[in-house]
């Protein structure tokens, strides 16, 4: 007959057989508890351009603030229309059925103001909006470098934004206090632009007449 005490002593218990699995499980339980107590924040962003700063002259002093959670960004910049030309000679020509418009702007702002990731658009008399991408034929194999213009000078963008809206300090060459910006548009032939709009996302925008 088998001695029950001997059987118990000779066979490892369940906890002993699975001690490695238990040891690996404990850190996972700690992470799960920590994740359950993590505070999530939902950021709601406006989707319409409801707060326009519309000028009746060729210049607009644009001042606007926007919030990314607990981070607030303030933009303070003067935007001026320098000139507008149609189908001038260059590396970009109009695709069939379109007309290319070249808009020259001048920006002026303190070097510490974040101005990257802007959007420049044209509007017609019906309020239709036209962007800078598409409708243009480039020379040879050159890509359309005018599709997404920046509102900052090349090599000196000034402060940039992190994914959470945090303003990152500028690196490299300091941004000047004023500089030119060129935006190139292709619009349907026969459509006349009446205004240029500059923004960094809704709801705020600056608008100048042409």
Give the predicted meaning of each segment.
Residues 2-210:
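Conserved functional micro-motifs across diverse proteins
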